Amino acid sequence: MQIFVKTLTGKTITLEVESSDTIDNVKAKIQDKEGIPPDQQRLIFAGKQLEDGRTLADYNIQKESTLHLVLRLRGGF
């Protein structure tokens, strides 16, 4: 199924995923497309931050759902 990931810059990334995919898997796919390391990614759906070990099905994320990607930047100001 396809889902969409919207970044803070307003860009929308389309991903091909399965309901059984873990959030880790989704972050790896985002890394493949965008080059953003998974440890800097925070995914939000329906106002909730998604935990790495859970699956898309756990959060009732269905086809054509839109997730929001927030970057967690490391250290320094």
From Swiss-Prot:
Family classification: Belongs to the ubiquitin family.
Top-level lineage group: Eukaryota
Keyword field contains Zinc: no
Keyword Acyltransferase: no
Transmembrane domains' residue ranges: none
GO cellular component, one term: cytoplasm
One Pfam family this sequence matches: ubiquitin
Protein name according to UniProt: Ubiquitin
Stored PROSITE patterns: UBIQUITIN_1, UBIQUITIN_2
Placement of covalent cross-link Glycyl lysine isopeptide (Lys-Gly) (interchain with G-Cter in ubiquitin): 48
Single GO molecular function: mRNA binding
Alphabetized CDD domains for the sequence: Ubl_ubiquitin
Record-listed cross-link Glycyl lysine isopeptide (Gly-Lys) (interchain with K-? in acceptor proteins), residues: 76
